[in-house]
Design a protein with these regions (language model features):
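Long extracytoplasmic/lumenal interhelical loops at the membrane interface
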Residues: 6-22, 26, 30, 34-73
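Generic recognition of well-ordered alpha-helical segments
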Residues: 20-23, 44, 65, 69, ...
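Short, flexible micro-motifs
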Residues: 38-42, 77-80, 126
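Hydrophobic transmembrane alpha-helices and their immediate junctions
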Residues: 51, 72-112
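Membrane-interface micro-motifs in multi-pass membrane enzymes
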Residues: 62, 70-74, 121-129
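Transmembrane alpha-helices of multi-pass inner-membrane enzymes
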Residues: 84, 104-116, 120-144
């Protein structure tokens, strides 16, 4: 229903997110490799929103971490971010302890999924939680 409402001009939650994504992709296509720069999303989004959909609400966050990273840091930034998660998967699979293997696999999966619905690594608390759990899950205690 919300997608239908969006096409009719309604300002629903999903409609706003669709609009954020459509407008963000316009900017990403112009700056695909290195993006527009860290922290420049709000200004660039305001410009593209005024151009494409001035009747719709603007935002300082596209509510999708992948879109945010692509827009600000380009493909280089997205690959760098995904490399962190790849390395976490690699470390978890190499752990001899089942609990570390399972938890070490679950943490990146959780974040990779929820980052489709919001920019969770943009907030201080969720970033701190991610780093805190990562520091314990991927530390090789046996080597000390």
């Amino acid at each position: 229903n919300e997608i239908t409402e969006y096409s009719l001009g309604s300002d629903s939650s999903i409609g706003q997110r669709i609009n954020f994504t459509i407008n963000s992709w316009q900017v990403i296509k112009k700056n695909p490799i290195i993006g527009i720069g860290t922290g420049d999303f709000p200004q660039e989004y305001l410009k593209i929103n005024q151009q494409n959909s001035p009747e719709r609400r603007t935002t300082s966050n596209p509510h999708n971490m992948y879109i945010l990273v692509l827009m600000e840091l380009g493909i280089v930034g997205l690959i760098s971010m995904l490399a962190i998660f790849y390395y976490q998967f690699k470390l978890s699979f190499n752990s001899p302890k089942k609990i570390i293997c399972d938890s070490g696999f679950t943490l990146p999966v959780l974040f990779l999924v929820v980052m489709f619905s919001d920019s969770y690594l943009l907030g201080h608390y969720t970033t701190l939680m991610f780093v805190f759990f990562s520091s314990f899950l991927y530390k090789d205690f046996e080597k000390n």
